[in-house]
């Protein structure tokens, strides 16, 4: 709705300005909902729309040789493009630093997520190219904080370590060391040993947004998250040791959730409570589980005995929406009593954009 109002305002105040809409989320109700671009072009609220990646289409648009289409081919080599030019930006008007993209897609295939129906392959830039862009932009604009737009900043550990090594070396002598934040996954100790956590801090990692989703291992296994509660404890302790802030992103009312799994989550929050306000800076409890079109859960619904409703949150399986909303409220109240900072209602995208200019 906000985007629509902005387009109407631009059309009214500056009718000669060209409006281009784009991105993987150019739709209502998930990646596979109604095509918002085609709808708004028909309403004359935009001149062009680009489904997903815009590096090649923007050139075609400038040359007058582009037809908006839902068909597109994913770019495999993200290192082939020059870094963004922000010369027209007044960075004093923005909070949270400069957005940067190091990868597209995701290494996980979570059951509730539709990203793999869009980004078929996880692709990433070299770690050096990411670090070089951050150094160049900070030198040019005098902005020293960066917000990653990636689904995961540590999806490729090879690229992640390479980036951290370059940034650590730069920060060790820089007058204004760089800091950065982004969405993150907890990995087992053998995949991310303590020396990598130390390196991350020295490289400028300030804040992580971690898709925990559930602190019940059985629920999380069904989600295909691929990390254990021991991995969570290890990661939280490492962040605490090196002064890295973390926001837990939670989903309440998964398809396998029961009173017992909610109880297990409460107990795990009790175990982690010594880190409330330190390495666990916030616990973001979003809406109850939404089953979006194009997700594995949507295709598994019949086998799981789920009846889909008129919207993505209104489904019936082991639980109904009334029960899930009560679980959510109970979990929030429990976390608050334990000393966690729990925003009243914050979704994943809002957590990432609070204090930044990025969208995920």
Question: Predicted regions: what is each one?
Answer:
Residues 25, 151-155, 185, 252-256, ...:
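Short, solvent-exposed turn/loop segments enriched in Gly/Ser/Thr/Pro and often Arg
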Residues 245, 260-360:
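C-terminal accessory regions of radical SAM enzymes
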Residues 82-246, 252-254, 267:
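Radical SAM [4Fe-4S] cluster-binding motif and immediate context
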Residues 1-142:
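Acidic, low-complexity intrinsically disordered segments
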Residues 20-21, 50, 181, 247, ...:
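Structural detector of well-ordered beta-strand residues that form the stable sheet scaffold
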Residues 33, 37-40, 196, 256-271:
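Catalytic cores of alpha/beta
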Residues 11-16, 168-177, 242, 274-279:
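Short helix-capping segments at alpha-helix termini
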């Amino acid at each position: 709705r906000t985007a629509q109002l902005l387009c109407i305002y631009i059309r009214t105040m500056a009718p000669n300005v060209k409006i281009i809409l784009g991105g993987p989320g150019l739709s209502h109700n998930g990646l596979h909902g109604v095509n918002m671009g085609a709808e708004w072009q028909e309403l004359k609220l935009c001149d062009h729309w680009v489904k997903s990646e815009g590096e090649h289409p923007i050139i075609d648009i400038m040359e007058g040789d582009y037809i908006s289409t839902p068909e597109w081919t994913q770019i495999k080599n993200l290192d082939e493009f020059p870094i963004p030019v922000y010369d027209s930006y007044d960075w004093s008007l923005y909070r949270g630093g400069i957005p940067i993209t190091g990868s597209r897609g995701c290494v996980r295939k979570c059951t509730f997520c539709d990203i793999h129906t869009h980004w078929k392959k996880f692709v990433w830039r070299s770690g050096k190219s990411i670090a070089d862009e951050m150094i160049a932009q900070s030198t040019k604009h005098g902005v020293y904080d960066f917000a990653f737009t990636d689904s995961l900043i540590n999806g490729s550990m090879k690229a992640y370590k390479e980036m951290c090594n370059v940034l650590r070396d730069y920060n060790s002598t820089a007058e204004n060391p760089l800091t950065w934040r982004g969405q993150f996954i907890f990995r087992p100790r053998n995949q991310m040993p303590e020396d990598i956590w130390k390196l991350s801090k020295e490289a400028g990692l300030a804040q992580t947004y971690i898709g925990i989703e559930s602190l019940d291992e059985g629920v999380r296994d069904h989600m295909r998250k691929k990390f254990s509660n021991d991995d969570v404890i290890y990661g939280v302790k490492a962040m605490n040791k090196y002064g890295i802030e973390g926001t837990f992103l939670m989903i309440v009312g998964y398809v396998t959730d029961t009173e017992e799994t909610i109880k297990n989550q409460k107990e795990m929050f009790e175990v982690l409570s010594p880190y409330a306000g330190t390495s666990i800076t916030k616990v973001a409890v979003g809406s109850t589980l939404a089953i979006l079109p194009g997700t594995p859960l949507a295709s598994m619904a019949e086998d799981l005995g789920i009846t889909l409703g008129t919207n993505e949150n209104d489904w019936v399986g082991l639980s109904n929406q009334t029960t899930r909303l009560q679980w959510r409220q109970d979990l929030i109240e429990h976390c608050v009593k334990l000393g966690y900072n729990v925003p009243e209602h914050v979704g994943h995208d809002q957590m990432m954009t609070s204090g930044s200019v990025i969208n995920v």
